[in-house]
Curated annotation (Swiss-Prot):
Gene: katG
Cofactor section: heme b
Species: Pseudomonas syringae pv. syringae (strain B728a)
Residues at the active site: 92 (proton acceptor)
Cofactor note: Binds 1 heme b (iron(II)-protoporphyrin IX) group per dimer.
GO MF term list: catalase activity; heme binding; metal ion binding
Pfam families on file: peroxidase
Lineage: Bacteria, Pseudomonadati, Pseudomonadota, Gammaproteobacteria, Pseudomonadales
Catalytic activity: H2O2 + AH2 = A + 2 H2O; 2 H2O2 = O2 + 2 H2O
Name this polypeptide is given: Catalase-peroxidase
PTM comment text: Formation of the three residue Trp-Tyr-Met cross-link is important for the catalase, but not the peroxidase activity of the enzyme.
Length: 756
């Protein structure tokens, strides 16, 4: 008898048609359950900061310096030095950051995983990471991939004669792809149709030659576009799979002026101003080259699509040797300077020293070469010492000359090389550290002493902190001040809920709720907020004036303490006595320490926890709630119990009654869940839309409650309903209060990295 199974076995666990296939618009809660101990091989007790502090950074840097010039046959170094490749690796790791939601960036080593490891803009960076694997292997748990990638970029710059601004460690690795980052809706690599909508396509310019005089372009909208392109938020790249812009020009059209618009938009969304943008491009392109030795159809599949035998590498190239002088990466074949492994100002000297005309790379990509054969023989070949070339430029390079604002900065850097060096050092540090959060997270001996405005500085605590007796006294004064539970809780929530786990910005520390721009945000109800802050500042002044020995309470601490007092009073109103944990130690930042423009990105377009939405968006209100919860590092159960508690504490913006499913607001009960799950009412959309709903008594038809999509999703979505049933049960009140206090405390302390 044959032992072969008669039943075909065609699929393994996890395969087949998924719920997402059946219901593509189903609310995605998986983004709330990423990076747990189930995916982390390091164990629950692993302390990366402790390990990093034991690292001999100078020894690591020496090992990296050795790697720089030890060219490997399997991937030869351009010009005998891997430095430019490593700069690109670090740049592309950090350059995914965007200000809109703080996601992306170098902070978790995501370049190792899909989709970033397979983006078209990251071709050959798989080799860069393999080149430094021996260093990672040697130091193991003491340095993360996230830190090593950035450090390697710094060492590359230093090894080629550039003085960097510094380096800080502290980026802990994650062990799976981030599922919360929205990279766009396009379904093809290098697509851009969704992020720009049905906007007019760029048209090819006429003669293919750029006129030399920049003033001819000063008042020109564009030679290729009739208006601004509107890039979808929060995206910061013009096409799917690019870090910033298309180096050939918008949609591949070689128009430097139009390219400047894309550069300004994308770099601006990564928190870079014009000077920082010029410095990054001019500084980065002082080194190395691009690669376009032959047609792109010679290049095989990306790492995620390559065969097992490729062992995580991709883009196998069948053109010539497939490496060295035959490398194909971007399809562009550009070398900017005659000293591509040495810091110099030659990039700008060449940019302004030649007049440029359009040509094509061997791969057929648009690039620029000096007119009339100028510069021939100036540039060395990356692999053949017998060959010489003329300098060349990208369309995005020429944007620095023919955009009026960029041109002014570029000429200043051309005439003042020391200004470029300083600006590039600072911009590079900002690029590679922008998503690390406050200085409390910076580790290592090379951390700069200078405090920078974009780091959202907070003063050090220079006074004695309040003790338990002081806390009790202050809470009593707060509760006797006439402020309601709703006012106390909503104010603390407004302060703490600005935190973003993505780039570690925001939170209650710093007391910036009292400063511009936060004090004026509509979501914070400025008129009510001003009154609450005035009362709390009075309590603060009275308390501090009565102390001896320098003891003080900051307004940042007092705002959180007031929220805690409100929660405790609400629990007491419900018959439960709880003490909400409180850890003093927050300090108050000044307006001068607060970059208003930078902080404006923290203003929520929606806060489902306060039933607030600034406008009408394509994204559903419930999806925006989950997005907010993910930024607050909440799980689905935490999100559920927190929202249910905040609803009955009546903190909705504008005192809206939507979702306040209780007859006793200000009392910490599980009424939200009990009444949402009540089968004695029937929910129907209100007239004119599907954003608000009414619950009518099934017998009388009377309206009992009103709610939003954010409220109703907790009864509609199967997973959220299952959690809601836990908190809506008859025996759940004690658990509900306990769990609410725990997650409330978590949110209040999200930015307290000093407590870790």
């Amino acid at each position: 008898m044959s032992t072969e199974s008669k039943c075909p076995f065609n699929h393994a666990a996890g395969g087949g048609t998924t719920n997402r296939d059946w219901w593509p618009k189903q609310l995605n809660l998986k983004i709330l359950h990423q990076h747990s101990t189930l995916s982390d091989p390091m164990g629950e007790n692993f302390d990366y900061a402790k390990e990093f502090k034991s690292l001999d950074i100078e020894a690591v840097k020496q090992d990296l310096r050795n790697v720089m010039t030890q060219s490997q046959d399997w991937w030869p170094a351009d010009f005998g030095h891997y430095g430019p490749l490593f700069i690109r690796m670090a740049w592309h790791s950090a350059g995914t950051y965007r200000t809109g939601d703080g996601r992306g960036g170098a902070g978790a080593g995501q370049q190792r995983f899909a989709p970033l490891n397979s983006w078209p803009d990251n071709v050959s960076l798989d080799k860069a990471r393999r080149l430094i694997w021996p260093v990672k292997q040697k130091y193991g748990r003491k340095i993360s991939w996230a830190d090593l990638i950035v450090l390697t970029g710094n060492v590359a710059l230093e090894s080629m004669g550039f003085k960097t601004f510094g380096f800080s460690g502290g980026r802990a690795d994650v062990w799976e792809p981030e599922e919360d980052v929205y990279w766009g809706s396009e379904t093809t690599w290098l697509g851009g149709e969704e992020r720009y909508g049905a906007q007019k396509k760029m048209q090819q310019p006429g003669d293919g030659t750029l006129v030399a005089e920049p003033e001819n372009h000063a008042n020109e909208e564009s030679r290729t576009a009739s208006g601004e392109r509107n890039l979808e938020n929060p995206l910061a790249a013009v096409q799917m799979g690019l870090i910033y812009v298309n180096p050939e020009g918008p949609e591949g059209v070689p128009d430097p002026v139009a390219s400047a618009r894309d550069i300004r938009e994308t770099f601006g969304r990564m928190a870079m101003n014009d000077e920082e943008t010029v410095a990054l491009i001019a500084g980065g392109h002082a080194f190395g080259k691009t690669h376009g030795a032959g047609p792109a159809d010679n290049v095989g599949p990306e790492p995620e699509a390559a065969g097992l035998e490729e062992q995580g590498l991709g883009w196998r190239n069948k053109f010539g040797s497939g490496k060295g002088g035959d490398t194909i990466t971007s399809g562009l074949e550009v070398t900017w300077t005659s000293t591509p492994t040495k810091w110099s100002n030659e990039y700008l000297e060449n940019l302004f020293g030649f007049e440029w005309e359009l040509t094509k790379s061997p791969a057929g990509a648009h690039q620029w070469t000096p007119k009339n054969g100028a510069g021939a023989g100036k540039i060395p070949d990356a692999h053949d010492p017998s060959k010489r070339h003329a300098p060349s430029m990208l369309t995005s390079d020429l944007a620095l000359r023919f955009d009026p604002a960029y041109e002014q900065i570029s000429r200043r850097f051309l005439n003042n090389p020391e200004q470029l060096a300083d600006a590039f050092a600072r911009a590079w540090f900002k690029l590679t550290h922008r998503d690390m959060g406050p200085l409390a997270r910076y580790l290592g001996p090379e951390t700069p002493a200078e405090e920078l405005l974009w780091q959202d500085p907070i003063p050090s605590v220079d006074h004695a902190l309040v003790d338990d007796q002081d806390v009790a006294t202050l809470k009593a004064k707060i509760l006797a001040s006439g402020l309601s539970v709703s006012q106390l809780v909503s104010t603390a929530w407004a302060a703490a809920s600005t935190f973003r786990g993505s780039d570690k910005r925001g939170g209650a520390n710093g007391g910036r709720l009292r400063l511009a721009p936060q004090k004026d945000w509509a979501v914070n109800q400025p008129e009510q907020l001003a009154g609450v802050l005035k009362t709390l500042e009075g309590i603060q002044s009275e308390f501090n004036a009565a102390q001896s020995g320098g003891k003080k309470v900051s307004i940042a601490d007092l705002i959180v303490l007031a929220g805690n007092a409100g929660v405790e009073q609400a629990a007491k109103n419900a018959g439960q006595h709880v003490t909400v944990p409180f850890a003093p130690g927050r300090a108050d930042a000044s307006q001068e320490q607060t970059d208003v423009e930078s902080f404006s990105f923290l203003e929520p377009i929606a806060d489902g926890f306060r039933n607030y939405q600034k406008g009408h968006y394509k994204v559903s209100a419930e999806s925006l709630l989950v997005d907010k919860a993910q930024l607050l590092t909440l799980t689905a159960p935490e999100m559920t119990v927190l929202l249910g508690g905040l609803r009955v504490l009546n903190i909705n913006v504008g005192q809206s009654k939507h979702g306040v499913f209780t007859d006793q607001p200000g009392t910490l009960t599980n009424d939200f869940f009990k009444n949402l799950l009540d089968m004695g009412v029937e929910w129907k959309a209100t007239a004119g839309g599907t954003d608000t709903f009414e619950a009518r008594d099934r017998k009388t038809g009377a309206v009992k409650w009103t709610g939003t999509r954010v409220d109703l999703v907790f009864g509609s979505h199967a997973q959220l309903r299952a959690i809601s049933e836990v908190y809506g049960s008859s025996d759940a009140h004690e658990k509900f209060v306990k769990d609410f206090v725990a997650v409330w405390t978590k949110v209040m302390n999200l930015d307290r990295f000093d407590l870790a």
